[in-house]
Amino acid sequence: MWTNTFKWCSKTEKETTTADAKVCASVQGLKALQQQIMDSTTVRGSVNNTMTPGGINQWHFHNKRANKVCTPTVLIHGYAASSMAFYRTFENLSDNIKDLYAIDLPANGASEAPALQVNKTKKIKSLRFKHIEDDVVIPVIEKRPPAEDIKSHLEQYESYFVDRIEQWRKDNKLRKINVVGHSFGGYISFKYALKYPDSIEKLCLISPLGVENSIHAITHKWEPNTTYPLTFTDPSSRYYTRKLNVPRFIFENQLNVLKWMGPIGSKLCSNYISTAYVKVPDQIYKDYLLHSFVGKNQTVQPQTIKVFTHLFERNLIARDPIINNVRFLNPATPVMFMYGEHDWMDKYAGYLTTESMLKNKAKASYVEVPDAGHNLFLDNPQHFASSLVSFLSK
């Protein structure tokens, strides 16, 4: 792992391997593309782009006149995204937050991609069962190890991101921080709050992945050859599941599949971006996404894919879901769940989790952003920023 990307990238060609040179070129390319977006973005106060000693690419917005939110606040992007996902909110947020940070997670965007080091353990196998109409039979074969062993194994993968977020906080010499995480970044942010409760002031989970309870949750015990009733509508139930699974080949290879398809993959990706980001007016951001998804500057590195495929099932349900762990959060930490009005993520799961926390006297709230989908900060940046600042400033 190199400690300073600019210094590392300044090595002569003889001093780097071919693989290193490709990674370096990718980092430089993504940083250049990010700079193009930032050059067209209005912010309040100063903006500074640096690589931390821990290898995190960060954008720091400092506005000494902002007085609504004085606690340093970090924005953590979702899967196959980067710090630029929040670019449409930078103006409004930097107007109200004294110190705002947007970072690229490790092995994402222009951040370094350190090796993923985990103890050699047999890969966790998905629960195998058989559907009988609306019921399910849990078979005897391949019984799972104890839940504690699985959880310990999963935590090794979570720590790849969680521990580096904590190191990022220390590198910036910050005390308590507000953490705002979207989708996969919301799941990681939640796990960060569990592991480092003293580092968190407030936690905002934006359309987080991995909230739902399910038959796949590692804490559930099942009797072999026993029939259980399934539910496809109650994401708080241990009997919950989803019918659709991502094909295994696509799940395990993800964006690489598009790259392997050549021009056809690029065309499919371009069509997807045009449809999914129809509310985003700036072509420069859409071009950035295309480069990130299928270009030589692909934002998602193998480490991220490996972590993702260990933490989640092929139906995108978490093996250690948020709803089953909220009781372990510091009850004094305010938490807000935020979704888009037309979000494809399971809003009901977030609502039920909020209700559960409130019943247990925790500080929780639930908000929906109108006229917005899963990327609510891109679809309705003004309302998103207003809701976030309102939560953080209370």
UniProtKB/Swiss-Prot annotation:
Keyword Transferase: yes
Protein's UniProt name: 1-acylglycerol-3-phosphate O-acyltransferase ICT1
UniProt domain comment: The HXXXXD motif is essential for acyltransferase activity and may constitute the binding site for the phosphate moiety of the glycerol-3-phosphate.
InterPro entries documented for this protein: AB_hydrolase_1 (IPR000073), AB_hydrolase_fold (IPR029058)
EC code: 2.3.1.51
Keyword annotations of the record: Acyltransferase, Lipid biosynthesis, Lipid metabolism, Phospholipid biosynthesis, Phospholipid metabolism, Stress response, Transferase
Domain (AB hydrolase-1): residue spans on this chain: 74-381
PANTHER family hit by this protein: 1-ACYLGLYCEROL-3-PHOSPHATE O-ACYLTRANSFERASE ICT1-RELATED, RE40534P-RELATED
Single GO term (MF): carboxylic ester hydrolase activity
Organism: Saccharomyces cerevisiae (strain ATCC 204508 / S288c)
Motif HXXXXD motif positions after renumbering to this chain: 374-379
Function, as annotated: Lysophosphatidic acid acyltransferase involved in membrane remodeling leading to increased organic solvent tolerance. Involved in resistance to azoles and copper.
One GO process term, biological-process aspect: lipid homeostasis
Family classification: Belongs to the peptidase S33 family. ABHD4/ABHD5 subfamily.
Further details from the record: The isooctane tolerance of organic-solvent tolerant strain KK-21 may result from the alteration of the expression of several genes including ICT1, due to the loss of their proper regulation.
SUPFAM superfamilies assigned: alpha/beta-Hydrolases
Gene Ontology cellular component annotations, sorted alphabetically: mitochondrial inner membrane; mitochondrion
The reaction(s) this protein catalyses: a 1-acyl-sn-glycero-3-phosphate + an acyl-CoA = a 1,2-diacyl-sn-glycero-3-phosphate + CoA
